[in-house]
Amino acid sequence: VHWTETERATIETVYQKLHLDEVGREALTRLFIVYPWTTRYFKSFGDLSSSKAIASNPKVTEHGLKVMNKLTEAIHNLDHIKDLFHKLSEKHFHELHVDPQNFKLLSKCLIIVLATKLGKQLTPDVQATWEKLLSVVVAALSREYH
């Protein structure tokens, strides 16, 4: 994947504005509420039976931060995303048996959360750049499945 200097700068500028724990929690909360079947992979999280339970669940917050920390690694290693996610792809495929479609759903939720955080700053160009970033991450996470 080729990244222009403008794309790199756009990713970094947006990233600097994010509170990772908040964005991660909100994206995962949105995933679980909008696509409730995705919760089946998170039985160890306890109560995910309602919007309120999901939004206040500390394990959702914890895992959301874990997701965002991995995304941080990707942002700081844009030219090596495929390698960066190799082991995680193996784990999600061989051990966790996660449907790779869920990665796409989470990326959609992340874009929506970015929109709520950035408002008018999420211009079409900014969105396109972040959609590109997340599609590269999703492809890397889904790699073991092919």
Curated annotation (Swiss-Prot):
Keywords, ordered alphabetically: Heme, Iron, Metal-binding, Oxygen transport, Transport
Native source species: Latimeria chalumnae
Family of the protein in this entry: Belongs to the globin family.
Residues binding heme b: H63, H92
GO biological process terms, semicolon-separated: hydrogen peroxide catabolic process
A GO cellular component annotation in the UniProt record: haptoglobin-hemoglobin complex
Keyword Iron appears in the UniProt entry: yes
Known partners and oligomeric status: Heterotetramer of two alpha chains and two beta chains (an easy dimerization is also reported).
Gene Ontology terms for molecular function: haptoglobin binding; heme binding; metal ion binding; organic acid binding; oxygen binding; oxygen carrier activity; peroxidase activity
Domain Globin positions: 2-146
Tissue specificity: Red blood cells.
Described purpose of this protein according to its UniProt entry: Involved in oxygen transport from the lung to the various peripheral tissues.
Protein name, UniProt field: Hemoglobin subunit beta
